[in-house]
């Protein structure tokens, strides 16, 4: 039996006009990220991008990521303008560790009912992240899926492609005993460990608006992930970088070994930097063991760089000039037998 009144897509919960309004709202953010290699404009079936002419043997490097349950906090506290930066950061920081310059980025935004204001804030944040990393936002997908998401909930995914000269790929193969380890400061928990963060908030019954070192706790927790691309591209050009590790899910124990040869281990001096207050707060209020902290969070270190010991002073000076806070935190040593590849003393 048919319905007596004609049905439309909007009656089913999908508002095409809202989608068009979103596209119109984000045009300026997209335009701001445009690179000379990008061909065509927003709205095509596919996005076109030439390879930069400076590369003789270009190798494409791709990555995809999300923001995890940090989104839950952002949605609950209506802080939508920075999770887009998180999304870009998680992707482009993974590319830079291999020496790749990010070229272009695409996003996927899914929700049950499209709120144009919220989505605009999110995508403008994505545009800001792309601008910070020199990456073109060339396309994306906004999926309005009634019945799939509750209330104002939404999810994000990002996809990034970069390029590196074949001879300049950084893969950890040059790492050797005696190399120094430099750490670049994080801006906070970045986008990892938020299921544990939310559990600590729940169990401790803490007020997220409470003051922590001069600003609300929730502001520490929603601080956008730091993007290291431009400063590290300059370091790569000026120095002899042997490896880089992006400290994400799995923390120190899981991420550092990903860039080390089997015969090497990282020996880190745990007192060589001070944990930001938010990590000490999480550890204390969640009664979290130190090992678990290093396994879950970046503990104030967003990126680790391995390079020859005689390059340390120049590298630290360059990073400081680029606005990075960085420290010498350890060295590479020879690994024997089945020793762990990361030691924190």
UniProtKB/Swiss-Prot annotation:
Q: Which Gene3D superfamilies match?
A: PurM-like C-terminal domain (3.90.650.10), PurM-like, N-terminal domain (3.30.1330.10)
Q: Name one Pfam family in it.
A: AIRS
Top-level EC class as recorded in UniProt: ligase
Q: Name one GO molecular function term.
A: phosphoribosylamine-glycine ligase activity
Q: Does the keyword Transmembrane helix apply?
A: no
Q: In which pathway does it act?
A: Purine metabolism; IMP biosynthesis via de novo pathway; 5-amino-1-(5-phospho-D-ribosyl)imidazole from N(2)-formyl-N(1)-(5-phospho-D-ribosyl)glycinamide: step 2/2
BP-aspect Gene Ontology terms: 'de novo' IMP biosynthetic process; adenine biosynthetic process; purine nucleotide biosynthetic process
Annotated compartments: Cytoplasm
Q: Which SUPFAM superfamilies match?
A: PurM C-terminal domain-like, PurM N-terminal domain-like
Q: Does the keyword Transferase apply?
A: no
Q: Which UniProt keywords apply?
A: ATP-binding, Cytoplasm, Ligase, Nucleotide-binding, Purine biosynthesis
Q: Which HAMAP family has this protein been placed in?
A: AIRS (MF_00741)
Spell out the protein name for this chain: Phosphoribosylformylglycinamidine cyclo-ligase
